[in-house]
Amino acid sequence: MGNQLAGIAPSQILSVESYFSDIHDFEYDKSLGSTRFFKVARAKHREGLVVVKVFAIQDPTLPLTSYKQELEELKIRLNSAQNCLPFQKASEKASEKAAMLFRQYVRDNLYDRISTRPFLNNIEKRWIAFQILTAVDQAHKSGVRHGDIKTENVMVTSWNWVLLTDFASFKPTYLPEDNPADFNYFFDTSRRRTCYIAPERFVDGGMFATELEYMRDPSTPLVDLNSNQRTRGELKRAMDIFSAGCVIAELFTEGVPLFDLSQLLAYRNGHFFPEQVLNKIEDHSIRELVTQMIHREPDKRLEAEDYLKQQRGNAFPEIFYTFLQPYMAQFAKETFLSADERILVIRKDLGNIIHNLCGHDLPEKAEGEPKENGLVILVSVITSCLQTLKYCDSKLAALELILHLAPRLSVEILLDRITPYLLHFSNDSVPRVRAEALRTLTKVLALVKEVPRNDINIYPEYILPGIAHLAQDDATIVRLAYAENIALLAETALRFLELVQLKNLNMENDPNNEEIDEVTHPNGNYDTELQALHEMVQQKVVTLLSDPENIVKQTLMENGITRLCVFFGRQKANDVLLSHMITFLNDKNDWHLRGAFFDSIVGVAAYVGWQSSSILKPLLQQGLSDAEEFVIVKALYALTCMCQLGLLQKPHVYEFASDIAPFLCHPNLWIRYGAVGFITVVARQISTADVYCKLMPYLDPYITQPIIQIERKLVLLSVLKEPVSRSIFDYALRSKDITSLFRHLHMRQKKRNGSLPDCPPPEDPAIAQLLKKLLSQGMTEEEEDKLLALKDFMMKSNKAKANIVDQSHLHDSSQKGVIDLAALGITGRQVDLVKTKQEPDDKRARKHVKQDSNVNEEWKSMFGSLDPPNMPQALPKGSDQEVIQTGKPPRSESSAGICVPLSTSSQVPEVTTVQNKKPVIPVLSSTILPSTYQIRITTCKTELQQLIQQKREQCNAERIAKQMMENAEWESKPPPPGWRPKGLLVAHLHEHKSAVNRIRVSDEHSLFATCSNDGTVKIWNSQKMEGKTTTTRSILTYSRIGGRVKTLTFCQGSHYLAIASDNGAVQLLGIEASKLPKSPKIHPLQSRILDQKEDGCVVDMHHFNSGAQSVLAYATVNGSLVGWDLRSSSNAWTLKHDLKSGLITSFAVDIHQCWLCIGTSSGTMACWDMRFQLPISSHCHPSRARIRRLSMHPLYQSWVIAAVQGNNEVSMWDMETGDRRFTLWASSAPPLSELQPSPHSVHGIYCSPADGNPILLTAGSDMKIRFWDLAYPERSYVVAGSTSSPSVSYYRKIIEGTEVVQEIQNKQKVGPSDDTPRRGPESLPVGHHDIITDVATFQTTQGFIVTASRDGIVKVWK
């Protein structure tokens, strides 16, 4: 544009927002600044944020067309330049008021980035300078000159990728040196007076006026660039090189510019040189580069490409050229729009990245080397993605990347770049991410060996407050992670404080230190900060030691309790840690916690000192008489270590030796070894005289001969007597009156020793019977002596076990209305109050005999029967037994591989069999059998007879088909009567790599199948889930369908499996299970690909036999309900759901196949009549919440069970009336309210009639498995869940005519009773850690529950 434009004063000044009234694709967001030349704004577009530059048109005759064409051509030329961001659009249609330029918005330019924390380090500055030269080189090779390179026009993304933007070819090339108006108008947009323009672009004012005078028209201030000025005013490459040199110099001088306007004009005339600013550039090669680029003579400046070659290996490391530039360029492409994708790509390439940037796998080089510092550039890519990650897998992958790269990064990068994002992840919504973020944060901070001055208070002011909430997190795995890492966190915080103190002392002792005045009373500051640090850590340690979950306490003790002692000091270790640890022995139900106490007590006692021995003595004695033998072993080991460290006083040692010596004949091998270990350590600690005078008397009863070297374990073990028999020991220990038993055994011993003349038989018949039982098990006199030696231990152990039982009964008694019949000695008896209904004679007869049929020859040949027609045959062996037992006709294998009943036509069901290739005998005695006399009857009568026969057969087939429907079973193997699973984990299967979507069990329960988002279907052998095998693996894996497998179902009565993927594929698989478990095989039989645009992918599917057809019914996301006849490979029926009611999420088919019900994302439940294929009725949930899963009610034919989004609601609806009849409500919200304080939902349902008392299993997003007793709702309970699950009760109430069963959390924990299923006395985290997606059951020798979760875990429970 012409220079005269700068002198035009606008007649009207409008706000930049006013210019958006005429453009419709862009919505004004905010102003980015305005100058006389351009008004700049940020606008919203459907593809993201854009920058809009508005040029107000004061003169309508301005020739803007040529400029627009030039910008369009520039955009095309720079299309492949990855470091250039040209204007994407130029517009001049805004009511002719203004011309507009549009480009993508980038938040930061280089000017802002230089002064923004975290500040750029040396390698990042080199990387940006390298990219600036690369961008200039890309533009020049494309035939484009920029014309206005400055820090404001160099955009820097959050991952330090440079974009050169705002190409200014429309700005004047030459400026008058004596008139700053043009410079201010076109180039000084920031008003900083900073000048980046090459000196040759300034010309003498008089010459400037003379050269351009003939081109100007006084009435037109803007000239057409097609004139001679375009040739004379052409931008040169050297001009851009000068501007780029100024930008690079400002980058390396922390924002100090090389020139302002006056200095540049002086530099042009040789009166000024920016030597003072250049000297601030510490790196010699960079300083030399800038000096060459800003040379006053344009001819002395090289091309950008030449500078890149010249500085290769000098200013710019070799790795920029060979790896970083091509690797980072892929993230600038549009194909990597997702942060999750970037993280996964980097994780995949991590090995190659480390090899290229570090040259080795372990960080053994010095930190200052450029190769390793190149990782900082990669770290910026990772950190730029962290806040926008969506998926749990991506977040965990990012944390894994950080952990791998952290040892190779500098302290400043770890504290300034990594730590804030780890604290951000500690507030993530996913518990696994929070837990892993805490672990990663701890490991990263442990790598910091020096503390920068500006980070001296990072622990008390930033890190510890940032993770404080995790100590009381709702998820147990997060608190576990905190307990696991708090010792290392405290240790690292103390090291930080000591490093700061050491630095302060060094500064205080340094007489040349200018900052000595800032350091006052370092010792006082240290003591104060140490006390504050102790208080912060102590608060969290006490919280964790008081956690309701024992596993959290156990984890804290097992992971660094000794380091916490060192952190707190001796006094607080005794007052805080030891005082809380002692209370753990009071938990009689969790031996793991008690065992962890003895594992940890040695380190604590070693730090506190021998003074603690008096406190610990009764605790150790209690451990020696624990009811759990593992705890005894751990107590023995703790005593051995404490004795070895000299922490026990000598009187205590002898007292323990007397208690431990009887363990030398204990039946447990580990306890014997532990006792031997303690005895040998004591023998080494005391004098020889004490060994023989005080120690040997304890050992004599348990060794076969005297020994000298008691301190040697092998010697002592070799002379030990045989231990007491395990069976005798256990039987005696379990006896109720163990005191009387030992009294009698003691009398027998006295009689053997001659102290008593005679030992009368016991008066108590129970003791006599007990003694008789012990003698029958092989108890000898020697065994009696060993039992008497263990008397004290057995008495205490028996009492401890009795206390556990008493406590459990105490807890049981607190349950309202619960009576323990076993404790009262009442024997249960069962009497049938209702007699089973007798079937009519004609129905019983139909179960024993079958109707023969005149199947035509074509059908017979199709199904393999070659017998001549009309020949009665005997019923094949096994056929009528099958009919009697199942009420179903014998089945045949069709050409499609599906077991289906045979039929006489496509409409009329017929009950026949091809077993042994013989038809069955007739069922009706009145049936006219073909005979020889028919030959003599006329043809007409013969045809009439055949017609009558056909009609009878048709009637009979319809009757049997109806009977088959009436006798349809809900499931082939229902749970046994009174089945109440205890929530014991049997198998933990982690073969799937992504979310498991469905579980299905075969009809005979020998197999079950799972499908997952990882694209695989896995087949499992149910028999192997009983815990009898050492390993449990899937027997088959199928992964050839592609995409994510969303649903599957077994075909009724067969080992054929139908699966569906989100890529539109539906496949039928055959499983050869006859050879299990040796060589099972799986092979596809049929498949079809759905039209993704018309139908979409399958969301749910079911299979059923309708007699004449074997139908696979599936529903798609676009509303199609299709019945695929697997015999004919065609559609038996197709229904179309109206999407106005919402997308189909689930559907269920009536057991008699008369109707089906679909559930939608808008809460609608719609019924279809399967006979006429017409919609019947539609009902909607009051809150229009999404229907997650549908199932038919096992008892009421018109009821459906619907799991609804939110509040864990499961409701049962009468589809005939549209009423909600029964609701299960596991939420704290008021029942049937439309509020959702609980976002949890049920994702999986299993329902069974269970012998007339229906049961329901539900599982979902709260990771709990609930057992609902629909007949007696108060008996419902949580089978398994997270370890932090409080105890709950269930109450029934009527609300607005709907029966509601509500789950209410109890205020106090109630211990499990004997007859209430429970998870056992152990509090291990066996539950799912992610959303449970499905639940099913199978029966082998007992009933099992199988569940699957979103993290790919499959668990089996009983």
Swiss-Prot record:
Tissue expression: Ubiquitously expressed.
Phosphothreonine sites (modified residues): T1316
Reported modifications of this chain: Myristoylated.
Classification via Pfam families: Pkinase (PF00069), VPS15-like_hel (PF22956), WD40 (PF00400)
WD repeat segments: 991-1030, 1040-1079, 1093-1134, 1139-1178, 1182-1223, 1237-1278, 1327-1358
Any GO BP: protein targeting to vacuole
UniProt KW Phosphoprotein keyword: yes
Name the UniProt record assigns to this protein: Phosphoinositide 3-kinase regulatory subunit 4
Species: Homo sapiens (Human)
